[in-house]
Amino acid sequence: VVHSHLDAVDCHVMYQGKGYNGRPMEDIKAAGGCPKGNIDALKDGVVTRAILFDATLLPGKATAQGWVEPGTPVHREDLETLEKMEHVKVAPGDVILLYTGRWKRRAEKGPWGRDTGFAGYHGDVAYFLKERGVSFIGSDGPTDVMPSGFPASVGLPIHQLALAAMGIDIFDNLDFERAVEHARQLNRYEFLFSAAPLRIALGTGSPLNPLAIF
């Protein structure tokens, strides 16, 4: 199982058999991989400003142990609340990263399956992404809240809307424990973010080791 990874903008998740810019599944099958919009398009790496949204700061969201329980959604209005709490403002080109305490919970309680769920972004966050011009989105979990609250036919609403509809790449399963500790000490939730995926021709994604530089 791949831990921290970056999805390719095309081919990774599709909606009704089509990816970004309407690319049909048949094109991918014929190419034996992702012919365009693959992970190799980001071979020179990603360097941009990051905003770390600490969901445990939201009133009523976190447990006493310091994490957000699986299945808890973080909505668009929650991000707007966190902007005020953290004294930040998301701007075009930013990557937004959501801390739910997933790895802290795992360290204390052990692993759990997808059937238990994960905290993450609700589908209405897509409006926030579009309005703010966000370039990348990520989380310490699979990014989408699970269960999503949407019909099963939709699957992963944030993945489908961000990747297939808007061309916004997604970082999944990142470990923010050290970053969030530093952010709390400094009371600063923005930093320089750097990540370089592997050069995988036709690849639909890549493992990576991103860096937060305060």
Language model: regions and residue ranges:
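Active-/binding-site microenvironments in catalytic and ligand-binding cores
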Residues: 1-214
